[in-house]
Amino acid sequence: MDAYEKIYQLYHLIKTKTAADLPGPYKVGVDLGTADVVLVVTDESGNPVAGSMRWASVVKDGLVVDFRGAMVIVEKLKAEVEAIMGITLDKGATAIPPGTVGRNALACGHVIAGAGLEPVCQVDEPVAAAKALDISHGIVVDIGGGTTGIAVLKNGELVFTADEPTGGTHVSLVLAGAYKIPFEEAEILKRDPARHRKIMPVILPVIEKMATVVKNMLAGYDEFNEYPVYVVGGTAYLQGFETEFGKAFGRKVHVPPHPLLVTPLGIAMFG
């Protein structure tokens, strides 16, 4: 399976609540996001075996703010996937925004440990995305709910990472203000593809700001100018996002299928 086939396969498995008939040993990854929590299982080669997700707000700007809530959700996802696969999962990997240090960096590991998964490693989110996309040379931009992280790879080696506190939550805040609706309604509106064309003029400045933030993070690194750019994360689902982000960024960007699932898949590959 190539990278995109794996992403399509993972989406199918989550949607149908089924498991692929692939032998173990298995790897587990847990992505604790600002807007969602995703648990993914792959085989040793990184092929998706099963997965589950929940929309939840247990992390803010890359930091766990609802430890108990996060742990309960991971427990539920773990139980769901175990029931689908008919096995017990005992260890897993998780991820953090680049530059997260100290207790904040340890929190994600504590969450999955509390849910019954022994933490085996913790990886930067955009690095996980690069792993899922099988990128050895390029720039990966991971736009989460509260943070935007980037990873630059050269000949398979990580040569640069950075992170800024901007993301999909800011899109929802702008929608809430523009339409005078609660934040929760704005989140639902943002996820409705039928409304994307209508809301694009409202949220375009936020997308342009995200592109500018990434551009500024890469300022001074002229050697990266010809590197392909991949954008992942839930915000990249927005219809027109790829075009508008690319315009503001000044370069063509690539949005893979089901961009919300790219980082969780990559985390599992590190498990």
Question: PLM features: residue spans?
Answer:
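Nucleotide/phosphate-binding catalytic cleft detector across ATP-hydrolyzing
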Residues: 1-34, 38-143, 157-271
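A structural feature that tracks compact, well-ordered secondary-structure segments
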Residues: 149-151
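A cytosolic small-molecule/anion-sensing beta-strand core signal
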Residues: 154
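Short glycine-rich anion-binding loops that position phosphate/pyrophosphate groups of nucleotides
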Residues: 146
